[in-house]
Amino acid sequence: MSFGQGGGGPFGGPPRDGGGTAGGQSGPFGAFGPFGGAPRGPGDDGDRGPGGPFGGGGSSAARGRGRPGRPSALVLTIIAVAVLVGLFVVFTNVYTDVLWFSQLGFTEVFWTEVLAKGALFLIAGLGMALAVWLAIRTAWRHRPADASAAARDSLSQVQRQLEPIRRLVFLGVPLVLGVFAGSTAMNGWNTVLLFLNQVPYGQADPEFGLDLMFFMATLPFLTLVVGYLISVVLVSGITGLLVHYLYGAVRVEEGGGVRITPAARAHIGITLAVFLLLQGVNFWLNRYRTTQSQTGNWAGALYTDVNAVIPTSAILAVTAVIVAGLFVWTVVSGRWRLSLIGTAVLVITALVVGTAYPFIVQEYQVKPSERTLESQYIERNIAMTREAYGLDDVEVTNYEGATDTEAGALAGEEANTANVRLMDPNLISQTFGQLQQFRPYYSFPTTLHVDRYEVDGQTRDTILAARDVNVDDSQSWVNRHTIYTHGYGMVVADASEVAAGGRPQWLLSEIPTRGPLASDQDYEPRIYFGHNSPSYSVVGAPEGAPAVERDRPQTADSQEDTAYTFSGDGGPSVGNLFNRLAYAVKFGSPELVLSSDVNEASQILYDRDPAERVRKVAPYLTVDTAPYPAIVDGRVQWIVDAYTTSDQFPYSTAQQLGEVTVDSLSQGQNPALQGRVNYIRNSVKATVDAYDGSVSLYAWDDQDPLLQAWQNVYPSSLRPYSEMSAGLLDHVRYPEDMFKVQRELLGRYHVTDADDFYENNDAWSVPSDPTREEDVKQPPYYMTLQMPGQDEPAFSLTSSYIPQITDGAQQRNVLYGFLSAAGDAGTGEDGVKAEGYGQLRLLELPRSTTVPGPGQAQANFDSNADVSRELNLLRQGASEVLNGNMITLPVAGGILYVQPVYVRSSGGTTYPTLRKVLVSFGDKVGFADTLQEALDQVFDGDSGAVTPEEKQAEAPAPGEKPTAPGTVEEELSAALEEAQDALTQGQERLAEGDWAGYGEQQKRLNEALKRATAADDALGGDAPAQEQAPAEASPAPSSSPSPTPSG
């Protein structure tokens, strides 16, 4: 087959037909080039215009016959309006984002992402569109001289139907594909920025000797680029082939043969050559990807990968390049034979060398001697996994695991026994709500937070929560977005000490807030930014305007509320009409334009969840799901942990975050961490001010290469941790989600010997939560703890291990390990991090241990006859017994379990109160009203332990609610509550004809009313004067709307 006679050689133009002069040299690349001259149609009959797919064609009459009717003016108007509305919606989203980031001071983050995405969209979109357009142009310009005659009848009909809209299609298809390619490429903006700003890791991989950052930054970028180029070549090649086929340059003969014109052959040959070159590059990159594989029991390149897959990938890469050269030879010679043979050889090589050979090596060489051959690669997996997850410096201690008890055994364990957490943050949320909510427009989270504070010179573990705003969606727009805008105050209880009646011992409570910890005068109590804040609030007013925001009750028992006006800089201004219109479109709220409550001084607060705010200003970070509030330097600050992560670290085992971070407390909660990682660092500590929403990002792990790369991208968004105040450092703790990831991996990777790791006979599991019926992991617990060998106690995050749970095997629920992470970062100095922060300590018990695990300890509790009898008594009167968190403590050479037992009476206004404490050491069980008594039962009558100061009054009889609160206000509330309950139960007994029961309830009613009267007298006369409200607060107008609680 010949390429024609226009200019000689493969790029010469084909002969013209009828009326042409010389042939095929008008373009710089001859007939094949996109700018080469096209053959003219026969004569000047107007069937086709001059060369190029966009030239005019045919007579005016012919064009007139093919032209469709014009759309009506109404249709054009509707289309124009729809387009304008769509563009305005897009504009408002971008414009409001600019306002939001600008107000926070993070415009660098916004514009960097926008410019990166925009550049990728343009580059990738134009690249795809240009390639497809050139393919279409080339194929159309070099169609046969009589395309209609060359094509079959069916294709001729398609040509005629396409002709009126041919120019639109030939332009539209490249544009649509370009937009799609550009939109897809935008998702790789962070990959590109990381590649361009990477810094060396400083450690080489064990197989190729390349810096580890090559695998985390360079290899993903190269994969992205090669994948994009392959897509471009494939899409443009297929598009060009379709046009060639449509216009007869590629024809399938009736006998089964295929005829291709020289120009089409050149086009297809060069496309295939480029495609194979890119495949060769892809094969070469596959060599490096073997170090990131996650197949089998171990991660990374194993024996078969190193000795079969990597060499064969190199062979396939060279073969692909050679076959690409054969396709170039096809273009030059016009012969397909060699290129087709080369393609067959490549396919066979891929099947035999790329697939069969590694399979044979694995099955017949590796499997019979797997332990020996894989040993060095397992060592790589162990070392690199421990490096990637920060497990390379775990302090391991062999622990005796004693089970025998004797008097005085806990005499030297004051640091642990004095800080035992008896308040369960998962159970007492309802207690917080009943005793400290005060208004239906306030709420507390389901699970409370754990932190520590210094009170009277001593550091105490505490249970705490912010009193957040809670407004029902059924409320009016004014109520939801301008009246109920914020919560009020922190509520803090001692984690170890218990008040009378089994209720929390408050360190900060009431409204106005007061207590040993602080008062309203010591910090700004208003919570405008929290977990439960409305989607947006409009706040602020001109100077002198009346306050409209519902602030707080004047006192805890007052029916009158104060009003308040936000005075900070917390959100973009909506003081002008354009901004109001933009936000009205963004939130679908025309009230922002129409309401008189929006004025020239108004600000709009939105994206108010602390984790979401950090996620927006630091899109390169994975944000922890458990931000917690702390009073820091006179402000409530949400402390948020954030991580740099990667799934490209060589030889490291990957984890699905959504699976390993789920436990009995986080199950079913959103948002949960998502994605797969095999590298993680707690590189950033962030704070979000609860009053004005300001965000600060601190580079916590400034040695992390990933964080250093992102600091190059965003040089002004991160601050050094040396700028953290001493007060903030005192409340930093070890991050919970990262600890969950680490404890999961350490269950296998505490084994560092390759042979033992291969046998997998010492793998551990995180125990199931013994207080739950379903099989779900026990959560880690924060507590102040002094580990064996530790110089002084530290606020730590802890978890335990039992032997690995395997399907079909009998579970042995004994304790194999205990893990703690030191969380004290403060030193009392600004910007100075404690040296021991983050140290992981692992206690390993003997494999022959009989120390029960948490599940077995719970079973021992449940099967104890004395415990069962006492619990049955507590269940009388329709009361519900609730098991609190199972605390595990390494003391006296063994393991001590402590579990608080709560009782909750039936009824919607009751709450759990601590009634008993369960304790076990070895197989001995103690069950008493106080921790001290329970310990003494276990340790032969005198444990020698120092426990928290007892502040419990005599507990009520079983079935009764506690009636001895710690403050006058609580006394009144509890007395009225019990009076209401006695009245209700008395009526029920009367209806049943139970006169004796009715008489008992009448006695309860009279006693409760006496206590209520006494408390009311105390409030009216001898009670301490209420603190004055802040100067800016004033009584709320009586006409202020009342909220409906959201339940």
UniProtKB/Swiss-Prot annotation:
Domain of life per record: Bacteria
Region (Disordered): 1-66, 544-568, 941-965, 1007-1047
Skewed-composition ranges (Pro residues): 1038-1047
Pfam families, A to Z: UPF0182
Tagged with keyword Lipid biosynthesis: no
UniProt topology in membrane: Multi-pass membrane protein
Keywords: Cell membrane, Membrane, Transmembrane, Transmembrane helix
CC per GO annotation: extracellular region; plasma membrane
Compositionally biased tracts (Polar residues): 555-565
Protein's cellular compartments: Cell membrane
UniProt feature, compositional bias: Gly residues: 1-27, 49-59
Listed Low complexity bias regions: 1015-1037
Transmembrane stretches, start-end: 71-91, 114-134, 168-188, 214-234, 266-286, 314-334, 341-361
Similarity comment: Belongs to the UPF0182 family.
Protein name listed in UniProt: UPF0182 protein Mlut_14990
